[in-house]
Each structure stands twice: as C-alpha cells, then as structure tokens.
Regions:
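Short, compositionally biased
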Residues: 1-63, 88-89, 116, 123-125
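Functional-site microenvironments in short loops/helix caps that host divalent-cation chemistry
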Residues: 11, 17, 21-22, 60, ...
Length: 192
C-alpha cells in the first residue's frame, strides 16, 4: 500500500469452520461459514504506519472513545515497529484513509485459522512458542507488546502474522453474545 507501506495477503473465497464446540458461549457453535475473497494486512498496523495516518489527517495522537472518560492508552510515542493502539473509531478511520476497511469478525477468523478447522494459525494445540507473546522488556513493560511480525512460527495459512497474541485487533462488526449461532452462513457482517 503506497499510503502506509503495509503488505497485504489474499484470503480466497470459500467455507471455513468458524467458532468451536467447547469454547466460551459467544464462540459456539462451530459452523461452516462462507466468506467472499478479501485482502487483509499481513501484520497489525505499526506505530510508524499510524504516525503517517496522523500526519496526513491531522488527527490527535490520543486515543479517545466517545462517551469514555478515561484515556485507555498513552499517546503514540512507542517504537515504530510496535503495534499501534487505538479505539475502534480510530481503526476504522485509519483503514478508510489507507483505502481499505476493517475486516468482519468472520473474515478475520478465516484469515487466522484457514479452512482445515484449526483453532490457531499453526494448528489446534496451544503452543506458547508460536504465539505472538508478550515480552517483559523494560521498554514495553507497561504495554506488554512486542514488535509486529517477530513470531513467524505463528504465521496463518494465508501468510498473516500476529493473529494469536500480542494485541487484540478490531473488526468491523459489533458484538452480540449469540451471533455465532444466529449469523447467516454466507458473508456474516455482524449484528445490527
């Protein structure tokens, strides 16, 4: 992407197994879902990329969530290769500026898991050595993050990185506790 320098990976159209049988209530049931083909960023947005967005748009570097009286994260001052932190509104604005959109939860889950029913990008067994794990480096102690793309053993079947661990990632749709059970079987876009 010429605006932010991000590399994208292609996730082809098709079915995948969404959810799980023995998970939290809002992750069940496991169902086959069809998702159209889409591009997704190979890594989470970095601080360096987010700074380009702030400069180009004149937005403040403080995370503000409408109706939330607290500052949830510090201003953008961390090292450029760490993941950027922001509100859902910031993430949506960033994606629009970069010429894309936030993925739906179904798109994100397919990009992370692939089509063979695995639970994690690397397979179905939890492996702390493959997760984009938290570090305790003095520089990022308070945030507990690591630079993006530094856990290649956790690469998804489509080549996306850091889709298990490090930071939570925003998706386009809103949350509903029964949505995995109630969602349409083709291109679910989230609850109303």
């Amino acid at each position: 992407n010429p605006l932010d320098g991000s590399e994208m990976v292609w996730v082809p159209a098709g079915e995948f197994l969404r959810g799980r049988e023995n998970g939290y209530r809002d992750e069940t049931p496991a169902r086959k879902i069809h998702v159209g083909g889409f591009w997704i960023s190979k890594t989470p947005v970095t601080v360096e990329q987010y700074r380009k967005f702030l400069k180009a748009t004149g937005r403040e570097d403080k995370i503000k969530i409408p109706g939330w009286p607290y500052q949830v994260c510090p201003p953008v001052q961390e090292e450029g290769t760490y993941p950027a932190l922001g509100s859902w509104y910031d993430a949506r604005a960033y994606c629009a500026w970069a010429g894309g959109s936030l993925p739906t939860e179904a798109q994100w889950e397919k990009a992370a898991r692939g089509t063979d029913g695995r639970l994690y990008p690397w397979g179905s067994e939890w492996d702390v050595e493959k997760v984009a794990r938290r570090t305790w480096d003095k520089y990022v102690l308070a945030l507990g993050m690591h630079p993006v793309g530094t856990a290649p053993d956790g690469t998804s079947p489509y080549g996306a990185l850091d889709m298990a661990g490090n930071v939570w990632e925003w998706v386009a749709d809103w949350y509903a506790p029964n949505y995995y059970a109630d969602a349409p079987a083709k291109n679910p876009e989230g609850p109303e």
